[in-house]
Amino acid sequence: MDLKAAKAELREKSRPYQTYSYYLIIPIFIILVFLLSLVGYNKGTFGTIVFVFVFFAHVWASKLDLVRKRKHVAPILMYVTQGLGVVLMVLLVTEVSAGGTGNIALGLSSLILLPIEIIAIVFFFISANDIKKAYPTMKEDAKAARLEYQELRRSK
């Protein structure tokens, strides 16, 4: 086997494990962001980081043929929350610039976005479980493909 084919095989065999890892890490990270915001630590970049990870996980999950279609539910719900967040931010800025305090938009955003994100978290865990059931030997397959690729790379 040549190096290029080994690299393609490594990519293909490690994809389920990478996707599984992302589908576990993303909801844990979202929960940590929730907890940090309850403590009073708000950082605007967390949402962007989560969005990027969700995008990559969704692209990788779409290439997993053995997993059911509900693997797309959690990322789509996160896209919806990001889009609604932008719309609600515009509403907040509009209300504040009109002389209001912004409380209506903030209350509306918490009533809409939080349940959607909680449902997305649940679907991330459900999808991770589906990936684990569809690819029971994914970790071993990824390690074996990585070792084979590294051996070929060292030999050349």
Residue ranges of model-derived segments:
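Cytosolic juxtamembrane helix and N-cap/initiation of the first transmembrane helix
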Residues: M1-F34
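Residue-level detector of alpha-helical secondary structure
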Residues: K7, R11, V50, L91-T94, ...
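Physicochemical signature of membrane-embedded alpha-helices that form the seven-helix bundle of GPCRs
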Residues: S21-I25, F46-I49, A74-L84, A105-I112, ...
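Generic alpha-helical transmembrane segments
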Residues: L32, V39-S62, V80-L88, I116-E117
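Membrane-helix interface and helix-disruption motif detector
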Residues: F34-V52, T94-S109
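Transmembrane helix-loop junctions in multipass membrane proteins, especially transporters and channels
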Residues: Y41, L66-K69, T94-T101, N129-P136
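Cytosolic juxtamembrane helix at the C-terminal end of the final transmembrane segment
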Residues: H58-L66, I119-L152
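Loop-to-transmembrane helix junctions at the membrane interface
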Residues: V59-T94, A105-G107
